[in-house]
Structures are given as structure tokens and as C-alpha cells.
Amino acid sequence: MSSQPSKALETFDNPTPGRDFHIHMEIPEFTCLCPKTGQPDFAVLYLDYIPDQKCVELKSLKLYIWSFRDEGCFHEAVTNQILDDLVVATDPKFMRLTAKFYVRGGIFTNVVAEHRKPGWQPQPRVELAEFESQSNIRG
């Protein structure tokens, strides 16, 4: 697999297609260029989805996200483009992409875009106690 930016998203078979489960990813190094000024824009992307038959492969996702580094994109457009491309690649039951852009001109921009497969209904939510820290880092 390449180590250069790429628009190709790879997938693998969902190991448990009979169960709805939630995949959460945090992508802290998204960059693109402001189409007006050419200045870099930075964001943290949060990808949440419930897969159907396919899951997105992580290295291809990293290279795909990297491919926007030198592209001029409005925040709203790039968030929706990424969601659309991920939906085409994986055909999930549900997918939400949240893009939290760093401050620009004194304004923080958050864009949330969602996809829901027609006819899919989520299971009722089960409320569980939260752990003190949801971090993957132990210390």
C-alpha cells in the first residue's frame, strides 16, 4: 500500500454483520486550504458509524484524509464530501462525520453531516455509567 496521499478508500468485510455496533474514530490532523486565502485550515474529525457489510480500512482512511492537505475547500463542502465518499465506500447503516475546525478570524466552525440507510432503525439506547476518563491513554 502507498504512503502517498490517495483518494482510494479501502474496506474489509464486517466481522459481525448481524450485530449493530458503533465504531468511533478521532482524526486529529486534518488539514486543507482556505479557498479564499490559501491559508491552511486545521480540524479534528470525529467519525462515528454503524457498519453494514463493510468497514473502512484505517491506513487508506489516513491517506485519504491526507489527500486534502493541498486542496482549497470550504469547511461545509469538505465535510460533506468526506462523508459522501465514506458512504459510497462502505454503505453503512448509519454514519456521522463531525468536523471541528480550529479558530479562523475569531470564529470556530463545527460541521456535522449524517447519513442513514433507508429503513434502518437504531436499537434503543442503553444508558451505562461513564468511566472517569474515556481516553485510550493510561496513566
UniProtKB/Swiss-Prot annotation:
Enumerate the active-site residues.
Answer: C34, D41
* Top-rank taxon, per record: Bacteria
Q: InterPro entries this protein is in?
A: GTP-CH-I_C/QueF, NADPH_dep_7-cyano-7-deazaG_red, QueF, QueF_type1
One short Pfam name that applies is QueF
GO BP, one annotated term? queuosine biosynthetic process
Q: Which UniProt keywords apply?
A: Cytoplasm, NADP, Oxidoreductase, Queuosine biosynthesis
What does the record give as its pathway?
Answer: tRNA modification; tRNA-queuosine biosynthesis
**Localization in the cell:** Cytoplasm
The UniProt annotation places substrate binding at: V56, E57, L58, H75, E76
Q: Supply one GO molecular-function term.
A: preQ1 synthase activity
Keyword Cytoplasm part of the UniProt annotation = yes
Reactions catalysed: 7-aminomethyl-7-carbaguanine + 2 NADP(+) = 7-cyano-7-deazaguanine + 2 NADPH + 3 H(+)
Q: Tell me which EC number(s) this protein carries.
A: 1.7.1.13
* Cellular component GO terms held in the UniProt record: cytoplasm
- Write down the PANTHER family for this protein, in alphabetical order: NADPH-DEPENDENT 7-CYANO-7-DEAZAGUANINE REDUCTASE (PTHR34354:SF1)
Sequence similarity: Belongs to the GTP cyclohydrolase I family. QueF type 1 subfamily.
| NCBIfam families assigned to the protein according to its UniProt record, in alphabetical order | QueF-II
HAMAP family recorded: QueF_type1
Q: What does this protein do?
A: Catalyzes the NADPH-dependent reduction of 7-cyano-7-deazaguanine (preQ0) to 7-aminomethyl-7-deazaguanine (preQ1).
Q: What is this protein called?
A: NADPH-dependent 7-cyano-7-deazaguanine reductase
Q: What is the lineage of its organism?
A: Bacteria, Pseudomonadati, Pseudomonadota, Betaproteobacteria, Nitrosomonadales
